[in-house]
Amino acid sequence: MSRIGKLPITIPEGVKVSLNDLEVRISGPKGELSKTFKGNIVVLLAENKLLVKPLAVSKNARAMWGTARSIISNMVTGVKEGFQLKLEVNGVGYRAMVKGKYLNLMLAKSHNTKIEIPPDIKIDVPKQNIIILEGIDKEKLGQFASIIIKQRPPEPYKGKGIRFENQFIPRKEGKKN
């Protein structure tokens, strides 16, 4: 029995859910999301609540049960409230700015790094060293944040690089003579 999978998902006011075979489509004030699940689980709508049930007793069906429930719960939260991630750019001369539909990063490389911003993600750069990402799809938001972080991951000696806000980076001691 999955502890997460058996919990019902309450649908808040202003959010509409439609179920077609294996596809779950959720729309709300912030936008619309849809996801198709494989045949291991079934999603039921009952009295303003969504229930996720496994179709088989197989190991794969039980593994996807809690995962599918969490994905659907994040979809409901996303179309109702949205998600936000903050990234910090640490380092001398490291800067970020938005130019059109590109995020321009200056990260002490021989060239500036340009990353195309996906259409469903909004980026705000209030300061040169803070990047705020907003969107309704938690999965795409995390994927895009990881693409940004991969450009210059935080290093353990001086802490320079791009990281999530309040992320702990274990520090190492430098060389001793």
Curated annotation (Swiss-Prot):
This protein's UniProt keywords: Ribonucleoprotein, Ribosomal protein, RNA-binding, rRNA-binding
Cellular component terms per the entry's GO annotation: ribonucleoprotein complex; ribosome
Taxonomic superkingdom: Bacteria
UniProt xrefs under PROSITE patterns: RIBOSOMAL_L6_1
GO terms, biological process: cytoplasmic translation
GO molecular function, one term: rRNA binding
Pfam family, one: Ribosomal_L6
NCBIfam families: L6_bact
Function: This protein binds to the 23S rRNA, and is important in its secondary structure. It is located near the subunit interface in the base of the L7/L12 stalk, and near the tRNA binding site of the peptidyltransferase center.
Oligomer status and interactors: Part of the 50S ribosomal subunit.
Assigned protein family: Belongs to the universal ribosomal protein uL6 family.
Protein name: Large ribosomal subunit protein uL6
Species the sequence originates in: Rickettsia canadensis (strain McKiel)
